[in-house]
Structures are given as C-alpha cells and as structure tokens.
Amino acid sequence: MRARIVVASAGLLMATGALLAAPAGRLAPKDIQALFFTGQPFTASTPANVKFKMVFSPEGTMTREPLAKTGSKSEGTWKLSQDGFCSTWKGSKQNCYRVQASGENKWAVIVSTQAVAYWSK
C-alpha cells in the first residue's frame, strides 16, 4: 500500500513538473543575454520582412539600423524579465517579449502568442 502511494506521489510530482516546464525551444532570459546581448550585431526582420542590424550591449543599451530604405534607426534600453526580456525604444513605451527557437540560427521574438520579429545570426 505504501509503495503505491509513493509511486502515485512520484508520478504526480513528475506530471506537475512537466506542466510547469517551459516549452521546448524557449530561451531562458540568461540564454537570451548570452546569445544576443553581447554587443555583437545580429539581424532582425519583421513579419513584413523589413530587416535591421541590431546591437544589444551587455550594459543594457541597444541600437537598430535598417538594412534597406524602409524602417528607422533608433536606440533604447533593455532588461531581462522573468521569462524573456523587455525593451524600450526612444520615444516609445516598454514592451516585453519571449524568444523561441524557430529553425537553425533563427529565433522568433514573441508577444503573447504572436511572433513580432525573427532574429538570426
């Protein structure tokens, strides 16, 4: 009887842990920082395929430059959040995001359930 209770309890704990785990492919905030917030440039593209050169410094600042004639240059600040990161572009309010793997060397930047940008290296 005790063995059944122990096994049932262990199964319940494992199931609960599986439900609380982040979805496969989602980057933890520290992994976002290690991959992207290093001061090295990477490419971001919008769902409409407007591309930018992005640079996030380890100190919490960021810049973007359009890679074509569309889009605008800007600067701002970033900080890690509980499940991703938040950014504030000059003249705009803060927005928070999660980052999810989306292929080889490609990541989706997500608000709620929608990708608002794709990052590549």
Please name every model-derived segment.
Residues M1-R4:
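Positively charged n-region of N-terminal signal peptides that target proteins for export
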Residues V6-A8, A68:
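General helical structural elements
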Residues A18-K121:
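Lipid interaction determinants
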